[in-house]
Amino acid sequence: MKRFFVLFFLLFSVSILSQIQDNVTWSVEPNPFNDSEKIKITVSGVDPSKWSTQDVYLWTWFFDSNDVEVSSQINWNGEWNNSKESMKMTKNSDGTFSFEFTPTELFQYNGIGKIGVLAKAKNGTGDKKTPDYFFEVGKFDLTVNSPKINPVILDREGSISISVTSTNEVNYYLYKGDEVLFESLNNKNFSKDVLGPDSGSDGLKLIESTTLKLLCEDTSDSNNFMYLSFDIVVEPISIETEPPFELKDGINYDNNNSSKIYLQLNAPKKDFVYVLGNFNDYVKDKKSLMNINPSNNKFWFEISDLNENENYWYQYQVFSKSPVSGSPTVIKVADPFSNLIISSYDDNQIPENSFPNLPKFPENQIGEFTFINKSEKYDWNITEFDKPKKEDLIIYEILVRDFDKESSFQNLIDRIEYFKNLNINAIELMPVMEFEGNESWGYNSSYHLSLDKFYGTQNKLKEFIDLCHQNGIAVILDLALNHVFGRSPLVKMWMDDPDNDSWGGPSNENPYFNQSAKHTYSVGYDFNHQNELTQYYTKRVVEHWINDYKIDGFRWDLTKGFTQNCDENNYDCTNSFQQDRVDLLKSYADYSWSLDPDHYVIFEHLGSNSEEMEWANYRINEGKGIMMWGKMTSMFNQLSMGYNDNSDISRADHKSRGFNDKRLVTYAESHDEERIMYKNLNFQNNP
């Protein structure tokens, strides 16, 4: 695999194709303004013809009064490649473009402290945009001295100081709902201590978590005001109790009660967790607080009274009282062991015919939720498939996105006769687990147990696999488990996020990932496979696809990335024999064979014979042996173009590599290589 070359090309391409228009000027009327006032934003210096269009669209987001970005950028903007028509700016007679709106109405939020804007083409792909610009909200300046983070955890016996400074004389009113808890009049400074429920001091106590709002009203003009919001989470008391039966991480179904499920989350170094979903109206209270299992310190939760024919979803809100520097106090994530998710980022671009009746992402929520679809069952026609022998495999590799115009599993089902006429006996699917965005090769995975909905439903993939098995065709799945991308809950629960924008790489306390990659071919965030939690996660991924989807084999992508012995700049180390990854990957093969004795285990290693022999000859006397990806592109292509130089194909024979049996997957083409026929037509030896 040559993804480092591809990445270089992409970076190079972006620098050439970028169409950012830098020399623009922004203005707003009135100025200054409050968030509840109608405003008119104008930009000058934009030439949409440079983007091959006549129209300009506003893309906007906002920050709360504590300068924390709170927008999902979904509800009003549309998609980056398809802005909503409602965001089109008006072209003025002087060549400027304007847009009028009331911030509180557009964003459906009170207490806006800053608004970010840029102008763009309807399809902003290729950086058809202007740089970011920001407008401060409010007719006077407020400085929040404390708390510096929002939300903030209030210790039960402790206190939090709310301290604010204004440039004007202000009347301050501290609200809980509609109730004024405290007021301070004709002051520039505001200060009030909020006490925990078990505090021994007298004063303003909070018994439960709540949002306090501070109304800051100009003494000379009551129409000139600003709101500050403080989300105060009173430290709850988690109940320590054993679950009714042994749970695995993720969703657990109660075999004796179909209306009940149990959740388990392993979150080391986290203090308490809430489960929020459509079954409890996303309410954070003691009823949504997860229990703690005293025997393993894992969080668990019971959800009951579920209707078999209704869809449900949930999200974890994970809290840390003392996070490492740069890490958030709270983060909202879906379950890392999700089998399906709903996403605020991608779902509105998924075609209805690919995934019918996909639930609409819940309003006023952000991020991703685990989707519980209890009615999604499949009755297999072939329950025990007699796989082709390893040495007889003829594999056809497919990127579902590009196979047919609709980019769906249904396309594959409709072409079964085409596959049969090719006389292949195996199909290898490039990654179909949940990846970031909808247009991808799939190697930017974020949820390895979750199916990406862009290609179709869970049952459609199962139908395709079942149909292949009925026609003697095995199905192999490409698996990228050396890394993950930033939406993964395994990253986000322990991430480095100093700018508090809810995105970042692994922090130094993340139990799953290296902060710096331990090999030279890394993309995304590098798994530490010597950690037991990572090994558990990997085995759960293997188990899921074998047991639930009857996948016949895995092509393990970039197995050079499964070492802890090197660093991201040492090519010699990465490409040399590493005992830790030899042993580790053997253990993963053993686990696969424990679930399916005839499972195909294929490594894309492209390394030295000494290392590949360890795997190819492993348990070969039992009929096992790991199959090695064997690139022969240049040699085969030299022959197909009619050249003698560099046309020796002897290494296509397993014996040339020291393998005791036929465990070499020789190929002339793959997704990483140029098409042979293209070179045949353009560079053939035709004197």
Where are these regions (language model features)?
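Bacterial Sec-dependent N-terminal signal peptides
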Residues: 1-22
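Substrate-binding/active-site clefts of carbohydrate-active enzymes
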Residues: 376-550, 558-577, 587-594
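Basic K/R-rich, polyanion-interacting modules in nucleoproteins and related proteins
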Residues: 231-273, 330-392
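Conserved structural position at the C-terminal beta-strand
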Residues: 119-121, 216-218, 318
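Active-site-proximal helices and loops of the catalytic beta/alpha 8
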Residues: 433-434, 441-444, 558-667
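Aromatic-rich carbohydrate-binding modules that target alpha-glucans
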Residues: 55-108, 179-195, 200, 255, ...
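Short, compositionally biased P/S/T/A/G/V-rich stretches that sit at domain boundaries
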Residues: 19-34, 136-155, 239
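Exposed beta-strand face motif in extracellular beta-rich ectodomains
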Residues: 111-117, 208-214, 310-314
